[in-house]
Amino acid sequence: MLEFFSRLSLVTKIIIAIILGIGVALLFPTVTPYLSLFGELFIKALKSVAPILVFVLVLSSIANFQVGHSANLRPVLLLYVVGMLLAAFSAVIASLSFPSTLYLNTVSHNNLQAPGSLADILKNLLLSFIANPVQAISEANFIGILAWAIGLGLAMRHSSDTTKQVMQDVSHAVSAIIHKVIAFAPVGIFGLVAVTFADAGLATLESYAQLLAVLLGTMLFVALVINPILVGLTIRGNPYPLVFKCLKESGITAFFTRSSAANIPVNLDLAERLGVNPSTASVSIPLGATVNMAGAAVTITVLTLATVHTLGIHVDLATMIILSIVATISACGASGVAGGSLLLIPVACSLFGISSEIAMQVVAVGMIISVLQDSTETALNSSTDVLFTAAVDIRSRQNS
């Protein structure tokens, strides 16, 4: 039996864990207090690895970033950044229009102070940026961690190849540890689902359904409205034939592999069939699999604002714009590990003074809905890589 279960994919295991958790909560509610330990251990494990994960992944990706010599690379990068920012803005609007409430253990947020004016937020942001790096990691100050990772990464871009390789090896090692933690996600999710449904009942299903609807609806909006607008402005023509071709031939594959990196060969093959210059595609598509994460920006923004709404924190427009920028920067590091966007939610939550403990509960909620969220997110991310690359190449041919 154990051997059969071990052969199942992580998605299948999570689905089974959710079904078992709901069943135990409804049929044997008195047992659920004993199952809470599984969920607590899982959240604790996520809390312990998240700070070093963010630091190492961002540092390594920036230090090893190679710009290349393709003239078409700069406009592709510009589309990547603009696309992620617009995706985050879309997520803000969707979250305001359809606010979601999460079921969280918020006992520890009694001392939580809502951010004041924009000046207070910027002041706290700047103070977080210049935190001691060791203290930032130990106290899970994700803004400080991000600042030091970016700074060191930029400085190490001029270091030797050996040093860069060491950082990449450390990044792979940390990712391997994360994979081990994620492997226990079904057990943790089983405990979390059982306790949540025992406490809140079937109303929890409605909460998760609305959260999923906001997430998936926003990603579809980005894929079918935002991206076509950007591509249409680039190629100065009807973008939809190219959009649908990329969604069909790249997005569907990425949906099932749930990995932008694994979808790189598919995208390179599609780019070749679209007649894209190989010198552009060979750089922009692997780079896109690393930094172009519009779906991750949506996930980080929606789940952060759902947390803010749940805790009753008032947020003004200026703060939401800052959140969109932070979500975009955070999303660039989401490719380091499967479900990486969820593990970067604490970075955005720290903007609002939300504790790491509560943020990790949100990560656990994300794990529960990740069966659909992560697949759709990857489909959007990966199909956008080849879409923007092809659009810039078409524009280049038009100008030549």
From Swiss-Prot:
Its main location: membrane. InterPro entries: Na-dicarboxylate_symporter, Na:dicarbo_symporter_sf, Ser_Thr_transp_SstT. One of its GO terms (cellular component) is plasma membrane. It comes from the Bacteria. It is a multi-pass membrane protein. Keywords: Amino-acid transport, Cell inner membrane, Cell membrane, Membrane, Symport, Transmembrane, Transmembrane helix, Transport. It is found in: Cell inner membrane. It catalyses: L-serine(in) + Na(+)(in) = L-serine(out) + Na(+)(out); L-threonine(in) + Na(+)(in) = L-threonine(out) + Na(+)(out). One of its GO terms (molecular function) is symporter activity. The chain crosses the membrane at residues 14-34, 48-68, 76-96, 136-156, 177-197, 211-231, 285-305, 311-331, 349-371. GO terms for biological process: serine transport; threonine transport. Pfam families: SDF (PF00375). The keyword Transmembrane helix applies. The keyword Phosphoprotein does not apply. Belongs to the dicarboxylate/amino acid:cation symporter (DAACS) (TC 2.A.23) family. HAMAP family: Ser_Thr_transp_SstT. Involved in the import of serine and threonine into the cell, with the concomitant import of sodium (symport system). This is Serine/threonine transporter SstT. The lineage of its organism: Bacteria, Pseudomonadati, Pseudomonadota, Gammaproteobacteria, Moraxellales.
